[in-house]
UniProtKB/Swiss-Prot annotation:
PANTHER family documented for this protein: CONNEXIN, GAP JUNCTION BETA-3 PROTEIN
Transmembrane segments annotated in the record for this chain: 21-40, 76-98, 127-149, 189-211
Membrane topology: Multi-pass membrane protein
Domain of life from the UniProt record: Eukaryota
Pfam name, any one: Connexin
GO-annotated biological processes: cell communication; placenta development
Function: One gap junction consists of a cluster of closely packed pairs of transmembrane channels, the connexons, through which materials of low MW diffuse from one cell to a neighboring cell.
PROSITE patterns: CONNEXINS_1 (PS00407), CONNEXINS_2 (PS00408)
Naturally occurring in which organism (per UniProt): Mus musculus
Keywords: Cell junction, Cell membrane, Gap junction, Membrane, Transmembrane, Transmembrane helix
Name of the protein: Gap junction beta-3 protein
Main localization (coarse): membrane
Gene: Gjb3
GO cellular component entries: cell-cell junction; connexin complex; cytoplasm; gap junction; intracellular membrane-bounded organelle
Length: 270
């Protein structure tokens, strides 16, 4: 697996992320990818080779190993890291789509035309939803993999001894011993803890995005009200003045004066 390419891709997401997203990316690379590459692969490298059983029955050791380890921890973590980082690619693709659309718009209408997007990487409109859905996908993937890890091995511990009973071709109950069980247990706890930290950071980032969106909507509503309030007050004052003028007029006006006003020419100032 080429981790350098994965790092380069995710570094592109970093410029569009919030503070929580940058911390999440640091945790993924420092506490998960580096530990996986440097240490965990070596600890689990001899997993099947040093899985020792007290039987000489051909095929029994392999069957017992497959029964207890349907999928190796190290491969499950590799899949988890790949699937967890994939939703971040949605953000990069969406930004690339915006930039391409902006480029075509400028080619068609010229460089002096108005921009479609003031900033293609700003989390507004559809990009905000893309970013939010990518966080939700990451959260679901983390929880699913933790559940799978806990279910397959009945917890996060690594026993020293496992027993295979009534499994063909093993003749009877066979005792098998796992290599480096304590070391594997420590790494399992460490990776589960790092995954839990990533889950907490993702939840915090989702809450931050929603809260920021709500506050921005409230501030927009207040600014709209402040702009529209002078117009409404001027209209109200005009109506009040007009009402006072009507009230100040004599309802019982002299009919003669009304006739004189009607016969007088209407003079308009030039």
């Amino acid at each position: 697996m080429d981790w350098k390419k994965l790092q380069d891709l995710l570094s592109g997401v970093n410029q569009y992320s919030t503070a929580f997203g940058r911390i999440w990316l640091s945790v993924v690379f420092v506490f998960r990818v580096l530990v996986y590459v440097v240490a965990a692969e070596r600890v689990w490298g001899d997993e099947q080779k040093d899985f020792d059983c007290n039987t000489r029955q051909p095929g029994c050791t392999n069957v017992c190993y497959d029964n207890f380890f349907p999928i190796s921890n190290i491969r499950l973590w590799a899949l988890q890291l790949i699937f967890v980082t994939c939703p971040s690619m949605l953000v990069i693709l969406h930004v690339a789509y915006r930039e391409e659309r902006e480029r075509k718009h400028r080619q068609k209408h010229g460089e002096q035309c108005a921009k479609l997007y003031s900033h293609p990487g700003k989390k507004h409109g559809g990009l905000w939803w893309t970013y939010l859905f990518s966080l939700i996908f990451k959260l679901i993937i983390e929880l699913v993999f933790l559940y799978v890890l806990h279910t397959l091995w009945h917890g996060f511990t690594m026993p020293r001894l496992v027993q295979c009973a009534s499994i063909v071709p093993c003749p009877n109950t066979v005792d098998c011993y796992i290599a480096r069980p304590t070391e594997k247990k420590v790494f399992t706890y460490f990776m589960v803890g790092a995954s839990a930290v990533c889950i907490i950071l993702t939840i915090c980032e989702i809450c931050y995005l929603i809260f920021h969106r709500i506050m921005r909507g409230i501030s927009k509503g207040k600014s709209t009200k402040s702009i529209s309030s002078p117009k409404s007050s001027s209209r109200a004052s005009t109506c009040r003045c007009h009402h006072k003028l009507l009230e100040s007029g004599d309802p019982e006006a002299d009919p003669a004066s009304e006739k004189l006003q009607a016969s007088a020419p209407s003079l308009t100032p030039i």
